[in-house]
Every structure is written in structure tokens, then in C-alpha cells.
Amino acid sequence: MIQRERLAKDFDAMAQLTAPGEGINRLAFTDADWKGRQYIIDCMTDAGLTVEIDDFGNVLGYKVGKNPDLPVVMVGSHTDSVPNGGNYDGVVGVLSAIEAVRSMTDDGFEHDHTIAVVDFMCEESSRFGAATLGSKAMRGELTLQDLHRLVDKQGISLYDALKARNLNLDAIEHMEYKRPVKSFTEIHIEQGKVLEHKAKTIGVVTGIAAPERFYVTIRGNADHSGATPMNLRHDALCGASKIILGIEEIASMQEEPPVVGTVGVVEVVPGAMNVIPGAVKLGVDIRSISKVARDSVVTLIKEFIDVIAEKRGLSYTIEPVAQDHPVVMNPAMIREIEEAVKSVGVDYMTMPSGAGHDAMHWADDVPTGMIFIPCREGISHNPAEFADMDDIVTGAKILDTVLRKLSLESTKLN
């Protein structure tokens, strides 16, 4: 049985494991992140799991089944955070998975397949500009070149961050997860307002939108702000402002299937009040459940950037960061989750996920499913992020039910 008090205690403990600042601050590979991961390791060990840490820092806890040679039933999420984030994004998935395993142990539940609980490293893109890096590493999608290419705001490369944690950098191109996987399940807060608006307790995810991310650097002339007439300026920030508004407008025009566009990074050089901005770096994030729609919007945006730059006498460069592909959830997994929801007896709806998740990297060749619980007012990536413990417990019960069924050899996903 899922124990509310035990689960609540874990959330309280994780809330204390943060760097100074408002909300939760566990950026990937920082000391706070490492302390959070150590707590997860301790929880896994206390739950009787056999813990392994791979060469990228992903934490895997195994509850061995009666037939260890069968493909593993994988479940997990992440515990790193954005700056000034909340205590539920990702954490719900990891702690609920551990609690589900405890529940099985408490009940003496016997299962055929080994269950693997995973705390994926560096799911958030906040530090290195690319998301779900731990999952990508486990799927063989990261190269040594990527480790050097991805750099944080302090100039620290992903390579150096891994090296500082004594992880095996030379293994990165050979660390693809080798064990066969029967299924992958992730439970997560919705990070939107739909469930709350529809008064539904659970969302059964049908597909995951995926981002294309790139940096745009616009260059003009950093001239004197007082001595340069308006008609002789090449102001990079004014050009960037036009581009930002253009991205909003172009994304809004694509209604079905919808595309969302965000400029979440704006860096101005030299950043002085008496100097016309000479360069601006924009971080652009374009997402959709449809790759075709997303690609169309990205093409229009790049054409628009070219028009603005030429019109204003500016130059620009575009640096790709990530190009993930949207995925659909496995129909058999959707059915298993729906059956579990019905057995618990709560209202649910099927829905796509607008945010990316670790689950998307398993969905191509592993039957994958996701469960959403509501978060208050849809707020996430924010200190005000909140999920009600009643909803967390309900989600954990559903996850427990799903994992028990999947861990039986008699359950076929076809």
C-alpha cells in the first residue's frame, strides 16, 4: 500500500536539498544536485534496491524479479531543477516510483521482470541549453563533441562538469543502456492548467511535443549612444526586439496542430546605458506535437530573421542546440494506465504533453506511457509550483498498479 506519510516525508526532505535562493535550486551537476541524488540513492537502498550509477551520473535502482533474464520494467524521472524552480517537477516521478517499489515490498508482491527505477541526470536545459541529457546518454545519443559543445553561462562545459564529478568521460559514446527494456513509465506534474480547468485528477498522456532550440546572435555596431544619429545606427537590440515579436506572431499563426515559440534568453553586449547594443544573443525554443508544423514555423522564423537583419544592416549567426522529435505513447501502455486509473476510481482525461520529458527518448522502440497529475494553476519552473499530496498519492497508487501489472511475464504489450 502507498503510504502517504512516508511519501510526504521524502518531499519535505528533498525541499531542503537546494542551493541558496528562492524556490528550489538544484542545477545539474552542482553540489545541491548531488546532495539530492544522494538522498535518492539512500531511499533506493533503504527500499532494498540494488543501486548503480552509470558513467553520466544517472542513478538506477533495481528491484530484482524472479527471472532476471527478462527485459526490465523501467520507471523514472529526474530531480535536477531549473533556477528558482519548484519541488515537484521531476521529483514526483522519482519519489512515486520508489514508493511504489516500497509498496510492493510491504505487500510481499512477487514479480517476474526486474523493475528499474531511474533518476535521470540533467533533464532540465537551464544549465547547458539542452534537455534530457541523461536519457540521451543512456540511449547513445550523446557524443564527446556534444560534451565540449554544451557550455553553461560560466563557461563550464558539460565535459568539465562531468569531469568534476569523476565520471568516465571516455565511455560516453559507448554507454548506451544495454539491457533489454520491456516498458518505460513516467509520472509527472502536468506543468499546465488543463487538468485543473477540466477538474480531472489524472491525465493519460497520448504524445509528447518536442523542442527545436537554437541561439541567434545578432550583430550591429556598438556606437556612442549620444553621438550617433538615429538614422546612422545599427542597433542589435532593436533588431532583436523585432525578431522576438516576429517569433511570437509566426508561432501564433500555426493553430492546428499548434506550435509554441519562446525566446527565453536575451544577452546584450556590451550592456551599458551609454552604448548602442552591438550584439544580442537570443535563446529560441520552438515546440509542437507535430514535427512538420514545428519545422514549418522554424523555417519561417529563419526567413524572418534574414529579412530583419538585411533591412537594418545587421549580421547574424544561428547556432543549433537541440532538435528532438515528438513522439506518441504506446497504445497498449495507454490502455494499461487507463485500466489502472479506473481501478483506483478517479476521473481522468487523455491529453498530449506540451513539455518534453525523459520518456520521449524511450518511446521509439520501448512501449512507453506517461501519467500526469495536476499542479496548482498550472504553475511550474517557479517557486510557486505546487502539487497537492492527495493527487501525488493517487498518482503513486496508479503507478504502483501499472508497474505490478507490467512486471508480470503474462502481461504482453502488443
Task: For each feature predicted by the language model, list its residue ranges.
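N-terminal hydrophobic or amphipathic helices/low-complexity stretches enriched
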Residues: 1-24, 64, 275-276
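Zn-dependent metallopeptidase/amidohydrolase metal-coordination segment
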Residues: 7-17, 76-77, 348-398
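A non-catalytic alpha/beta surface segment that caps or lines the substrate-entry region
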Residues: 19-64
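A short beta-alpha structural unit
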Residues: 27-29, 262-271, 283-289, 315-334, ...
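Active-site metal-coordination/substrate-binding segment of hydrolases
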Residues: 41-45, 50, 60-163, 389-394
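Alpha-helical metal-binding/catalytic segments enriched in His/Glu/Asp
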Residues: 75, 84-124, 212-218, 224, ...
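Midchain, well-structured core segments that form catalytic/ion-binding scaffolds
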Residues: 122-123, 129-291
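His/Asp/Glu-rich mid-to-C-terminal helical/loop segments that flank catalytic regions of hydrolases
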Residues: 208, 224, 228-253, 298, ...
